[in-house]
């Protein structure tokens, strides 16, 4: 049977690159909304968890396109800020760029000592096939610290201030191939890939 298209429900180019690299085996099947010429705004993330927000996006795109969908939601949780930024990471600080968001985080933490700067990236990935009534959710988490200043221009989002002790670098300083061995998104989508492998062998997609 012909392989079915799987839609990637994100407009974040950084996330698109990472997900396609992690799921490279399915690169011919996974299509972005732009590639499929669906000019749509994704729905407002009104959920109270990463899982809920990811599924809100997946369900919305599935209903419009009719295709199986992959979506995700992720965030940065900082202990010293009582778990912020969490599900509001992308909206933190309002409609400003990530340089400004990073500056706001560092300002909030200017008096926080190193031992209290623990943080983690969380990712929840969703595969949703509306026609087959299949919904799979996987997750990934990576622990680190909030650096005192941004370092590196690789990656995207909050990567330049997320210090990863194992490599003694921020995520903004490491190559994408290296990041894709350890990141929260890699962990979540590696688990999702195991499901896709079995699902495809079953002839579903």
Curated annotation (Swiss-Prot):
User: Which residues does the record give as substrate binding sites?
Assistant: 10-15, 74, 156-159, 179, 184-185
Q: Which Gene3D superfamilies does this UniProt record tie to the protein?
A: 3.90.950.10
Enumerate the transmembrane spans: none
> Which terms does the record give in the GO molecular function aspect?
dITP diphosphatase activity; ITP diphosphatase activity; metal ion binding; nucleotide binding; ribonucleoside triphosphate phosphatase activity; XTP diphosphatase activity
Q: Which residues bind Mg(2+)?
A: 44, 73
Q: Which InterPro entries match?
A: dITP/XTP_pyrophosphatase, ITPase-like_fam, RdgB/HAM1
| Any single biological process term in GO | nucleotide metabolic process
Q: Which domain of life is it from?
A: Bacteria
**Active site residues according to the UniProt entry:** 73 (proton acceptor)
Provide the Gene Ontology terms for cellular component.
cytosol
Q: What reactions does this protein catalyze?
A: XTP + H2O = XMP + diphosphate + H(+); dITP + H2O = dIMP + diphosphate + H(+); ITP + H2O = IMP + diphosphate + H(+)
User: What is the free-text note on the cofactor?
Assistant: Binds 1 Mg(2+) ion per subunit.
Magnesium: present as a keyword of the record? yes
Disulfide-linked positions:
none
**Which cofactor is essential here?**
Mg(2+)
**What's the family?**
Belongs to the HAM1 NTPase family.
Q: How does it assemble?
A: Homodimer.
Protein name per its UniProtKB record: dITP/XTP pyrophosphatase
